[in-house]
Each structure stands twice: as C-alpha cells, then as structure tokens.
Amino acid sequence: MPIIKIRENEPFDVALRRFKRSCEKAGILSEVRRREFYEKPTTERKRAKASAIKRHAKKMARENLKKTKFY
C-alpha cells in the first residue's frame, strides 16, 4: 500500500494527486480490476497467449516499416 507523508502547508488536492500517482506506479488499480472476478486458468493462459501474439505482430510490423525506404 503506497504511503505518502503530507508536507507542512501542503494542499489536500496536491497530496491526493501524489497518492494517486504512487498507487498508479504500484499497479494497485490494475491488480484490483484483474482480481475482481475469478478467471479460469485456461482463460488466463489463452489471454496471455493472445497478448503475446499481438505483441509479436506489432514488433514485426515495426521492423518491416523500418526496412521500407520511402525515396
């Protein structure tokens, strides 16, 4: 759990913004959303594999774009 120390004479909205930023860096909200509902192990593996395939396709597209010369 991210903890922030409120500085002297620090406005509440600034402290809240720092807290939100630290929560985002820690990945708390994404973890909560991921654990909100039970996901079967097969579904989890399927989603991870689809993500890897998509990542690979994007990487290959970027590499092919680099090799193309536009002159």
Swiss-Prot record:
GO terms of biological process kind: translation
Alphabetical list of InterPro entries matching this protein: Ribosomal_bS21, Ribosomal_bS21_CS, Ribosomal_bS21_sf
Matching Gene3D superfamilies: Ribosomal protein S8 (1.20.5.1150)
GO molecular function, one term: structural constituent of ribosome
Bridged cysteine pairs (disulfide): none
Record's keyword terms, sorted: Ribonucleoprotein, Ribosomal protein
GO cellular component terms attached to this protein's record: ribonucleoprotein complex; ribosome
Pfam families listed in its UniProt record: Ribosomal_S21
Recorded superkingdom: Bacteria
NCBIfam families noted in UniProt: S21p
Family affiliation: Belongs to the bacterial ribosomal protein bS21 family.
Protein name per Swiss-Prot or TrEMBL: Small ribosomal subunit protein bS21
Organism: Wigglesworthia glossinidia brevipalpis
